[in-house]
Amino acid sequence: MVIIGPRGPGSQRLLLSLLLLAAWEVGSGQLHYSVYEEAKHGTFVGRIAQDLGLELAELVPRLFRVASKRHGDLLEVNLQNGILFVNSRIDREKLCGRSAECSIHLEVIVDRPLQVFHVDVEVKDINDNPPVFREREQKVPVSESAPLDSHFPLEGASDADIGVNSLLTYALSLNENFELKIKTKKDKSILPELVLRKLLDREQTPKLNLLLMVIDGGKPELTGSVQIQITVLDVNDNGPAFDKPSYKVVLSENVQNDTRVIQLNASDPDEGLNGEISYGIKMILPVSEKCMFSINPDTGEIRIYGELDFEENNAYEIQVNAIDKGIPSMAGHSMVLVEVLDVNDNVPEVMVTSLSLPVQEDAQVGTVIALISVSDRDSGANGQVICSLTPHVPFKLVSTYKNYYSLVLDSALDRESVSAYELVVTARDGGSPSLWATARVSVEVADVNDNAPAFAQPEYTVFVKENNPPGCHIFTVSAWDADAQKNALVSYSLVERRVGEHALSSYVSVHAESGKVYALQPLDHEELELLQFQVSARDAGVPPLGSNVTLQVFVLDENDNAPALLATPAGSAGGAVSELVPRSVGAGHVVAKVRAVDADSGYNAWLSYELQPAAVGAHIPFHVGLYTGEISTTRILDEADAPRHRLLVLVKDHGEPALTSTATVLVSLVENGQAPKTSSRASVGAVDPEAALVDINVYLIIAICAVSSLLVLTLLLYTALRCSAPPTVSRCAPGKPTLVCSSAVGSWSYSQQRRQRVCSAESPPKTDLMAFSPSLQLSREDCLNPPSEPRQPNPDWRYSASLRAGMHSSVHLEEAGILRAGPGGPDQQWPTVSSATPEPEAGEVSPPVGAGVNSNSWTFKYGPGNPKQSGPGELPDKFIIPGSPAIISIRQEPTNSQIDKSDFITFGKKEETKKKKKKKKGNKTQEKKEKGNSTTDNSDQ
């Protein structure tokens, strides 16, 4: 039980002091519990709340808690029932070691008032640790001469438990040589010992393995064991002995000096020095001044120490002995009989003279390489010598005289296949057994320049980014020559040719020794997409041989050209363009179209359009097509809209980084009926000085005059046809095609058949004109009876050379209605140049080069991008004058009709009939002009 503070009678002052002590000072009290180690989690220890005199309901309010400086997580209190329980595994040996007493001290703290209680929990030991030995095996050396009752101490076991659980008992496995004895030391600890009860013999039992077991006194008992390995030490009590009392050996008289005669073998059952044997020769009979034999003292190997001669001695008797190294030493004896046989003991001799080396690989068959002579000191059949040569070689031996031979060339040589030959000349006598001798002849083959340098492949493809720095290393060619030395020394050079107007050497160079190819100047993808040339490799032989390899260098495009705005009718790209727009137009009305080109290709030439932030306001009713460049109204115009708008259109490509240009469009809003009959661009020039038109060139004036004349004729014919039409034909019904006129430049045709039109009092039906190339033959029957199927695009429509530089413009792709993926950009389907499109859908022209499609023709196609879907027999809103880059949209408007829309148009000044050289010069001039206009436009921003 816990005694909380001393109690007794006292005055009021004493009671007050006790209350203060209870509230502010630490109260004292102590509890004692016990628990066994290794108890499971949740094991009951004691009702600590009840023993401390605390109610269960006040444990939480008074912040009942257990604090311990060490091992605080081993025990825990359940605040619901006030029971102290085991929280985690308790290991007494880890907690207290081998101490006899082991307890866990806890401090229990409660507040309101503050009280501290001390709790000691005794940890009781259980037999959870078996006795163990420090090592798994103990080695005990014992001499075989050790006397009986000899004691050999062993290392005892240890038990981590205490008390009875640590009391140990030893037991030894059964054997006839040793018994176990327990020795008690001064500290009351016990030590096991082995006592020898029977003498040992190492030759019979060199080792003895015993098992020592130990048992503790716990319940249940735990055991341990250790292997006892007894090694019996040797004593020199045995002498060496040979495996045979005598040996017999037969030798030929021609055996070489130091030849092994026999290997003797003696054994000693002892070990160590007692078993180490040393061999020696005691006597050799017959006695001679020269010792003909020697013996190795360590191995017992007998070798010849001189030359045996059958004519001198035909037999020898060798007496040998073996002595161990024990103390005292012991010896064994034996005898070796050697019999000598008479044989053919003289070998032939071979001599090679007059060598002609090295041999040229182009040497003639039959060329003498060397002279060979042979001899043998024997006589008779033993002295007759026959020579032979290594087989399967391009050489042979030719006998020239007795015992003389010539080594000659038998077949053609090839140094690249075999550069040297190791020939073996064998001379064999006629003895029995025959003797032979060999001589080696090394024949080197000298190189002849018969192999040209060879490349790994006949052609290489190299990719180089444009705008590379001068002297840039772009590739390395390597050729291999199978010849040797200077015949294999390869040098590289360019195979000179013309690349356009320049020499190949002005573009690239090749290092003569390394084969590295360098670009001498920055390459321009727009000027040169593919550079194909050959590199020659020649060796230094006489005469030199060579070969060529082809290199195809593709110049990869980089975004180094900003979008260039196509020239306005005034003749300057990037200048302000004025447009007049009636206020009565509805949403989606196209005001103008911005046209731009990019000299790059691929993504670098894919253009997008957007209004500059300065031009985008909350009330500006205009929007530009992302990929079409068409500026259209976003809503119906009203009186609140400003009469004039200055729009800045940003044209941006998709390169990395993107390059931009800016176009300025001036839009003036006019009331209905106030639009002048002349071109909106011309009228705006009088209103706004910034949009004033420049002088129109002579060709444009002539074209407009011709078109105006044709327009008047068309109107007259149209009026006649309308008056003669049946009354059943509605004003909005499709009309029949009518042939207007025919001229040297083509046929002009008018069509209203199958035309989807809108009947409106404000906007009467409009008629379209279109110009076809002269190759299109139209008859009146064709015009009056259009085919039921849609017409295929005319393959004769072509862009002139003056606009070849603009073939990469993505705006033309958008005009053609081919950007069907919307803003998806890269997912769009690029148009082809085929004129056999099965079902054209919209009246625009599509550039075949804008997205990397290589062609110089423009094909008329229909697509969903056209706001008006024409019927199969109808003509589009725009026409192309053959031989001119202009795309002209001409519509016949009634007197009070409003101007529908205007386009940015370009008229070329170069004719297709000019020479090719002049075309290139004109294209370069126009490209420079467009770049200058782009720069001017950027400065306007």
From Swiss-Prot:
Span of domain Cadherin: 30-133, 134-242, 243-350, 351-455, 456-565, 581-678
One function term, GO molecular function aspect: calcium ion binding
Membrane topology: Single-pass type I membrane protein
Sites where a glycan is attached: N257, N265, N548
Stored Pfam families: Cadherin, Cadherin_2, Cadherin_tail
Ranges in the topological domain labelled Extracellular: 30-697
Intervals holding PXXP repeats: 734-737, 790-793, 823-826, 863-866, 882-885
Gene3D superfamilies in alphabetical order: Cadherins
Positions on the Cytoplasmic side per record topology: 719-941
Cleavable signal peptide: 1-29
A single cellular component GO annotation: plasma membrane
Superkingdom field: Eukaryota
Gene Ontology terms: biological process: cell adhesion; homophilic cell adhesion via plasma membrane adhesion molecules; nervous system development
SUPFAM superfamilies assigned to the protein according to its UniProt record, in alphabetical order: Cadherin-like (SSF49313)
Residue span of region Disordered: 818-941
Main localization, broad class: membrane
Coiled coil stretches, renumbered: none
Record's subcellular location: Cell membrane
Its biological purpose: Potential calcium-dependent cell-adhesion protein. May be involved in the establishment and maintenance of specific neuronal connections in the brain.
Protein name: Protocadherin alpha-12
Upper classification of the organism: Eukaryota, Metazoa, Chordata, Craniata, Vertebrata
Gene: PCDHA12
